[in-house]
């Protein structure tokens, strides 16, 4: 399975998608000569030792290979990974949200309203809208490791700054910047997993990663509730700064560069300097050069084009955004229901999020079994699976979400034991992640070469919903009461239940009538039959040309038909 958890996301490059669709063909045009030197043995884990060691070292074995080409500017040597290449990330080895709990302290410290304090959550999540659109293309230009190093370093500084903020304005700005800078893992961590694991291997890894954006905001209040109650809100941000700083150091020390096009591009440059001959990566050989400005322009505009022109993308993104926003609404509602309604302390109130944690864990376990079911079904079929085959978990999840939300809404009375509404949140979280992961997989399989832009659009839209929903939660609960206010998202989820069923039954017919989905299917067929790699830019241009030609033919046909009818009318009148 390949998905953008929260995020997920512009996370998969076109090279990764292409390799997945036609098989693991990294060795096409690769010389069969074995390396002449033995790799040094390391004590770090086997997979990491292969890709972390000699990160920028060009050994004589690289230069001695018989690469295709002549080594000239016109016909450069085309390099690829060697059979036992230490930097090939896919070579197999040998046999967040503790700030939610500090809202009351922030209100007292700065003398502000509940709505302004809630902006700290909303602006943080709003940063998820813009950050991945920038960090994903930059990681393809400058590598995953450099982006991780920079973003974790700056996010650590901003979190530390938030801990010492002297005004609410500076705190809100720092929260937004922390979300924007710290959102790099939402796009680049799935890409790193795709770099390291083959499509058949990455299902469980992606499953675990996809649960993290839901587990983080749920686990955070459990620990943060007691910390905020005893040490104050500044220590919550201090804890986040410490955690991000440790992560920054760990990423710097242990995470190697994994993006194959960047590794081979840098290797070709180094080998060209060493030998005086011209080398080029096989992954770059047939592509026009692409600047950072060009990639950023596409990253900022193309997702919105696909979002509003493709019905499948729009409907699934709206559905995911509603349930994602509902999750953040729950984070704002739980203090109202359990602390205000039942008199729980801030620390004990954080324990109400335990149901969300259990539901997310159940969904990860469910997807581990679903991954095996999907693999067996693909093996039995003996042919590529249809995107609609990804939807059964979404069908199940679409039913669990309204069940869990209605359960929670109408068991929040003080006369009912507190465990009962928390059990309802288990079903909600279970269904939420099932729908989230299944629909993202469906979008990726439906749009293949456009997957990065589709994930970017989905991530941006759901982050907007996640930022907006908490802002009106307090007013909604004050105006409607706990039960009916909690039922509003349940009714929205209930209205969305038919979507997975309709896509499962009619998805193929709908896809073939969508401009870019149809082009993605054509590109996928071309890559499978001809074993060629097609970039997202190429596919976009081809889709637009086909659409223009189809529109022109339709206009010409309509004009001809109108002229013919007019001629007949004139003949009759004569």
Curated annotation (Swiss-Prot):
Record: glycosylation sites: 19
Chain intervals for the UniProt region annotation (Disordered): 1-44, 552-574
Domain of life (superkingdom): Eukaryota
Alphabetical keyword list: Cell membrane, Glycoprotein, Membrane, Transmembrane, Transmembrane helix, Transport
Annotated compartments: Cell membrane
Ranges annotated as biased composition (Polar residues): 9-30
Record keyword Hydrolase present: no
UniProt xrefs under InterPro entries: MFS, MFS_dom, MFS_trans_sf
Residue ranges of the TM segments: 116-136, 148-168, 176-196, 208-228, 235-255, 318-338, 348-368, 394-414, 419-439, 449-469, 484-504
Membrane topology: Multi-pass membrane protein
Induction per the UniProt record: Expression is up-regulated upon exogenous application of fusaric acid.
Pfam families: MFS_1
Keyword Cell membrane set for record: yes
Main location as per UniProt: membrane
Application in biotechnology: Fusaric acid is phytotoxic to plants such as cotton and banana. It has been shown to induce programmed cell death in plants. In addition to a mild toxicity to animals, fusaric acid exhibits acanthamoebicidal, antioomycete, and antimycobacterial activities.
GO terms assigned for molecular function: transmembrane transporter activity
A Gene Ontology cellular-component term: plasma membrane
Role noted for this protein: Efflux pump involved in export of fusaric acid, a mycotoxin with low to moderate toxicity to animals and humans, but with high phytotoxic properties. Constitutes a self-protecting mechanism of the fungus against critical levels of fusaric acid within the cell.
Family, similarity comment: Belongs to the major facilitator superfamily. DHA1 family. Polyamines/proton antiporter (TC 2.A.1.2.16) subfamily.
Record-given protein name: Efflux pump FUB11
Species, as recorded: Gibberella fujikuroi (strain CBS 195.34 / IMI 58289 / NRRL A-6831)
Taxonomic lineage: Eukaryota, Fungi, Dikarya, Ascomycota, Pezizomycotina
Gene expressing this chain: FUB11
